Amino acid sequence: MTKLTLSALLIALTAPALAAASGDADHGEVLARHWCAACHIVAEDQEHGADNVPTFSAIANKQHFDQAGIARFLQDPHPKMPDMQLSTYESADLAAYIETLKK
């Protein structure tokens, strides 16, 4: 296998992982408003959320916020959260959106 072929193969295999890691914040906002807004306040224009549930802004502004960690968490959420069965890409998109709420 030539170096060029090997390089092309490595790029092809890692591109989806890199895309998932960065996420699409605009799509993440759409997902947040659809899946998460019943409990979490996901945007500044939202007035109501469930009691004792952090807002997305509060999550984004935690001292140790980690976009990749949030994306992993969404793949296997805690028992109080519904299992939305998000794809890796959708989890990355939601995490990217939450990242935009940092102040």
Show the residue positions of the predicted features.
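Sec-dependent signal peptide recognition
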Residues: T2-L10
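Sec/Tat signal peptide C-region and signal peptidase I cleavage site
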Residues: A15-A21
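Soluble non-cytosolic domains of exported or imported proteins
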Residues: D26, H64, Q85-Y89
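C-terminal capping alpha-helices of c-type cytochrome domains
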Residues: Q85-K103
